[in-house]
Design a protein with these regions (language model features):
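Aromatic-lined, polymer-binding surfaces characteristic
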Residues: 1-170
């Protein structure tokens, strides 16, 4: 993937206004990166410094940048990244988790507080405040909760481990 990703334009099947590169939509890129960030964290110390640099420089950083900002003239990803919607939750979880794995504070901050890092326009913290009712009901509905809740849980666990001062579960 580290050799392939830099060569990719938009996926040839363009069924989405938010197209991906590896997959037909950016949502799938985000889901893939969430799972891959977990795997990368597990094997990080088994890789040489050169391998880590190659993977991070050619795959993870460009993918995180793409998820946040898009590519070329298509900046729909930035709008999605800052939305109050499960697609944005997957995106912020992906960028934040790979940010933790790569020790990229800039990615973690954008994931937590939105592209502008103010928390006023987007970000995981804002999603936690707006996508759940006061009684804890997920606004997109129970019928969708199994898919949409997972990035909240896995990213919150990462936040709790890396930034316990945020008291994410409180």
């Amino acid at each position: 993937y580290a050799r392939l990703y830099p060569t990719l334009g938009f996926h040839p099947v363009s069924l989405s206004p938010v197209p991906g590169r590896l997959f037909w939509q950016t949502l799938n890129e985000s889901v893939w990166l969430v799972h891959t960030a977990v795997a990368y964290d597990c094997i990080y110390h088994t890789l040489s410094a050169k391998q880590r640099t190659t993977i991070e420089k050619n795959l993870f950083a460009p993918m995180a940048d793409f998820i946040m900002d898009g590519m070329g003239d298509n900046h729909a990803n930035n709008k999605t990244f800052n939305k109050m919607h499960n697609h944005a939750t997957w995106a912020t979880a992906a960028v934040g988790m790979i940010g933790f794995a790569m020790n990229r504070e800039d990615y973690v901050n954008k994931a937590l507080y939105g592209s502008d890092e103010t928390g006023k326009r987007g970000g995981f913290i804002r999603q936690m405040d707006y996508l759940f009712s006061p009684d804890g009901y997920f606004t997109e509905g129970a019928y969708y909760q199994r898919y949409a809740i997972w990035p909240f849980v896995i990213f919150a666990q990462c936040i709790e481990n890396k930034l316990p001062e945020l008291e994410i579960f409180s």
